[in-house]
């Protein structure tokens, strides 16, 4: 019998939390020099240690841009994080006992989008092979597709959609909370601002990043520019060297580069779903939500995805809220029970 962890006591959980450190071969030697050893945070429901024969489904939670595994563990006043929601829902018998696994997808640029990139490293492979493999090998999971779901918010919501489309057979369900989608509205409006910011550094991307990292405080333009560099590294890397990227606009004039933006759109869930009927058909739950005042227009993206999934003759649960992009953890109270309910239990 394990003694309950300090984190579990700090968060006032009835369940427990374990933190492992995983050496990921998928991330080894990445051009940004980001660590290949990553924390894997695992929530265990109450009673996990009491019955050594029982197995549990696992829900994999993906953080958003600028997040890491610690972000999902952190506690803020008057808010409830994903582990606290899980513990409460299990305690109140609104959700069957399940494991929740927090995946760390942070990079030097602020995030990986959970895709395989020659510039960032193979973050999709790291998630579905290294993290899932580690959890199945070390915890009593239902170690099949039917025993796993993936969820996330913002870039994590994008990651959840990307993984079920790119790696069918790993997860049986997904939930996307305000997930990145319909890039024509979500990302394109920022390109002119980013062009001007990089022009001030003569388009020396390494110099911009170094200046960004050296600051104690960053303004919104700098933050947006770093965010777009992270997306560029995920969607349109040019080579396997740090900052060797194809920007989605012409460096001299700022004109949109249709050839590069087409590479971004190849990752856009709103563009992809129409051609992914087989991948979507095997899922037991497809869940999307967003606030109707989302600052990145992701409510439109969610509507487009929902309609295109329905056009395939498939069901999708699509929720909208009178809300924006921030502080949406309350929606875990909807998605977590819905995901756990469709998974296999032993």
Where do the protein language model's features map onto the residues?
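Non-catalytic cap/lid and distal C-terminal segments of serine-dependent acyl enzymes
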Residues: 1-346
């Amino acid at each position: 019998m394990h003694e309950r962890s300090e984190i579990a006591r700090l968060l006032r959980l009835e369940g427990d939390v374990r933190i492992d450190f995983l050496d990921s071969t998928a991330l080894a030697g990445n051009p940004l020099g980001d660590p290949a050893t990553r924390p894997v945070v695992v929530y265990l429901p109450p009673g996990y240690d009491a019955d050594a024969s029982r197995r549990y489904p696992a829900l994999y939670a993906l953080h958003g841009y600028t997040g890491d595994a610690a972000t999902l563990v952190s506690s803020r006043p008057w808010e409830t994080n994903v582990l606290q929601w899980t513990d409460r829902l299990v305690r109140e018998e609104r959700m069957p006992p399940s494991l929740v696994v927090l995946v760390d997808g942070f990079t030097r640029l602020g995030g990986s989008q959970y895709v395989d990139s020659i510039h960032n490293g193979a973050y999709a492979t790291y998630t579905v092979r290294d993290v899932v493999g580690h959890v199945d090998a070390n915890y009593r999971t239902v170690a099949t597709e039917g025993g796993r779901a993936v969820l996330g918010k913002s870039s994590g919501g994008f990651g959840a959609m990307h993984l079920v489309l790119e790696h069918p057979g790993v997860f049986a369900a997904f939930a996307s909370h305000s997930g990145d989608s319909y890039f024509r509205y979500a990302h394109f409006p920022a390109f002119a601002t980013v062009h001007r910011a990089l022009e001030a550094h003569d388009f020396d991307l390494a110099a911009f990043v170094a200046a960004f990292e050296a600051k104690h405080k960053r303004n919104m333009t700098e933050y947006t520019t770093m965010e777009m560099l992270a997306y560029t590294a995920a969607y349109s890397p040019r080579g396997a060297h740090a900052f060797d990227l194809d920007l989605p606009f012409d460096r001299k004039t700022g004109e949109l580069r249709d050839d590069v933006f087409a590479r971004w759109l190849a990752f856009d869930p709103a563009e992809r779903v129409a051609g992914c009927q087989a991948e979507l058909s095997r899922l037991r739950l497809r869940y999307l939500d967003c606030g109707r005042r989302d600052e990145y227009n992701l409510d439109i993206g969610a509507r487009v995805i929902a309609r295109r999934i329905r056009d395939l003759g498939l069901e999708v649960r699509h929720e909208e809220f009178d809300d924006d992009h921030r502080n949406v953890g309350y929606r875990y109270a909807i998605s977590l029970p819905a995901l756990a309910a469709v998974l296999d239990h032993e």
